[in-house]
Amino acid sequence: MSKPILSTASVLAFERKLDPSDALMSAGAWAQRDASQEWPAVTVREKSVRGTISNRLKTKDRDPAKLDASIQSPNLQTVDVANLPSDADTLKVRFTLRVLGGAGTPSACNDAAYRDKLLQTVATYVNDQGFAELARRYAHNLANARFLWRNRVGAEAVEVRINHIRQGEVARAWRFDALAIGLRDFKADAELDALAELIASGLSGSGHVLLEVVAFARIGDGQEVFPSQELILDKGDKKGQKSKTLYSVRDAAAIHSQKIGNALRTIDTWYPDEDGLGPIAVEPYGSVTSQGKAYRQPKQKLDFYTLLDNWVLRDEAPAVEQQHYVIANLIRGGVFGEAEEK
């Protein structure tokens, strides 16, 4: 009897296994970091400004008289801003991170044969490679405070404190000088080993892992800080509308959990990096929205779907580096079922 041909499930979904909370912002003095529980929250406030015409002009608007008239017409804007108080030089950003087991186990799959083969493939990876390399890179991105994004740029000093929380108590603690840990590579660092082992144990399901992550960035009294910006889908009448809305939780400026997660999974150095870009976030097509470019095009056969199908359906295991990339996508989570042809 011939063996049935395996095909991708039309319904295939995975839950994320790195589950961060929103990150809340507070402010205080660098010398008082040990008493930061008492620091006040950074608040978001509105500011109205008069801007100047600086956008690229259409050909019909380049007449000097029209330009002068445009300049005389005020460009009024209302925006949200967030700043440290005038007597506080340090930003504190705090979030928690759950590391969940069951990586590679789909939360939804409507094809039992495909599910069995997928689990077999993931089990082979875990037995051969384990989660050590991925966990080391996730630990690296926690320790270097990549999750601060723009708030990290230009900071005089950045310290990251990570606590392993067990039954509400601190079971183990780490401190890192974030600026001493690079953003462009993942060189082996002995001080990260214990944290990486803990993350790997969480991914393998051998223990409950909840981390409290606190970063302190010394940026200067009264300096502007950068919470997440909200996407306003229904802007209605654009005239008079606020042009920038910042995210806050209970009046505290905050960074979206999705943005924290994006920073933590910025570990993909296995794509064709012809531009010297460095690590990018793990995405099925290597998408970098800030550049409008996908670095893992299907024609290169290095995108997630091609690698996964070859590995699961055809028993063509990719190179070890690309295996890490595929499993990292499963840890990321998402809906990966077979697309319907129209």
Curated annotation (Swiss-Prot):
InterPro entries: CRISPR-assoc_prot_Csy3 (IPR013399). Disruption phenotype: Mutants lose phage DMS3 infection-dependent inhibition of biofilm formation while there is normal biofilm formation in the absence of phage infection. Decreased production of crRNA in the presence or absence of phage. Disruption of the entire Y.pestis-subtype CRISPR region disrupts crRNA production but does not alter phage resistance (possibly OLNs PA14_33350 to PA14_33310, and the flanking CRISPR loci), indicating this CRISPR is not involved in phage resistance. GO terms for biological process: defense response to virus. The keyword DNA repair does not apply. It comes from the Bacteria. Keywords: Antiviral defense. It holds the Pfam family Cas_Csy3. The keyword Amino-acid biosynthesis does not apply. Part of the Csy ribonucleoprotein complex with a probable stoichiometry of Csy1(1),Csy2(1),Csy3(6),Cas6/Csy4(1)-crRNA(1). A Csy3(6),Cas6/Csy4(1)-crRNA(1) subcomplex is also formed. NCBIfam families: cas_Csy3 (TIGR02566). Belongs to the CRISPR-associated Csy3 family. CRISPR (clustered regularly interspaced short palindromic repeat) is an adaptive immune system that provides protection against mobile genetic elements (viruses, transposable elements and conjugative plasmids). CRISPR clusters contain sequences complementary to antecedent mobile elements and target invading nucleic acids. CRISPR clusters are transcribed and processed into CRISPR RNA (crRNA). Cas3 and Cascade participate in CRISPR interference, the third stage of CRISPR immunity (Potential). Involved in crRNA production or stability. In this bacteria, Y.pestis-subtype CRISPRs do not confer resistance to phage DMS3 or MP22, but instead are required for DMS3 infection-dependent inhibition of biofilm formation and possibly motility. This is CRISPR-associated protein Csy3. It comes from Pseudomonas aeruginosa (strain UCBPP-PA14).
